[in-house]
Amino acid sequence: MDAVNACGAVAPSHVGRAALLRMLGAQPYVPVWHAMQRFTDVRDATAVDELWVVEHDPVFTLGQAGKLEHVLDPGEIPVVHVDRGGQVTYHGPGQLVVYPLLDLPRLGLGVRDYVYGIEQAVINTLAQWNILGERREHAPGVYVGGAKIAALGIRVRHGCSFHGVAFNVAMDLEPFHRIHPCGYRGLQVTSVLDLGGPSEMDTVAAALLAELARQFCFVLHPTSGWLSS
């Protein structure tokens, strides 16, 4: 399958469509998750798509396919059962998390192309620092030399996406040893910094957002303010 070219994959009438960008900073996981659910539940055909960028407090999240046996020793880090696809992963400081809240049918996108586009955005971002990112068949996400650098877990409800991608930038990777990441025993993880890339979250966020905008032909419009309760 060829890389997703948003200007070809997205419906022609929606190329260059506006999307709001919310830079949420450091946030606990659960309030952001609940806000994504509310946003998705109340949006209609006129709602503007949004991308939320966040750095979560330490948390393990267990997706719908997740098994508690893959959580080995969480210690002081909470475990939250969530409604995304996939297994268990870790979120924490130094990890860039992006939640695209998109109306996929309006963009002319199927789930497969959507997932492929997110992965391609990460791969293209890594390439800016001469890091070779790769896909793995039947295991969504992006890998470098067999180690996972970006985890992908999504949910699509009534054609609208929420949850998203978690990209390891410059973080303490020790908590990944307390789980079987994404349900795979012994799966190694890595980060942009460990591979010689930048440690600055703002630098990596700017690069990834530009690639996501390119993949899905967005024009991103930053907006201020937190989310309604």
Curated annotation (Swiss-Prot):
Subcellular location, in the record's words? Cytoplasm
Query: Which biological process terms from the Gene Ontology are attached to this UniProt entry?
Result: protein modification process
The protein's name in its UniProt record: Octanoyltransferase
Annotated residues that bind substrate are located at 84-91, 151-153, 164-166
Give the family this protein belongs to, as stated in its UniProt record: Belongs to the LipB family.
What InterPro entries is this protein classified in?
A: aa-tRNA-synth_II/BPL/LPL, BPL_LPL_catalytic, Octanoyltransferase, Octanoyltransferase_CS
Biological function: Catalyzes the transfer of endogenously produced octanoic acid from octanoyl-acyl-carrier-protein onto the lipoyl domains of lipoate-dependent enzymes. Lipoyl-ACP can also act as a substrate although octanoyl-ACP is likely to be the physiological substrate.
GO-annotated cellular components: cytoplasm
| GO MF term list | lipoyl(octanoyl) transferase activity
Q: From what organism does this protein derive?
A: Xylella fastidiosa (strain 9a5c)
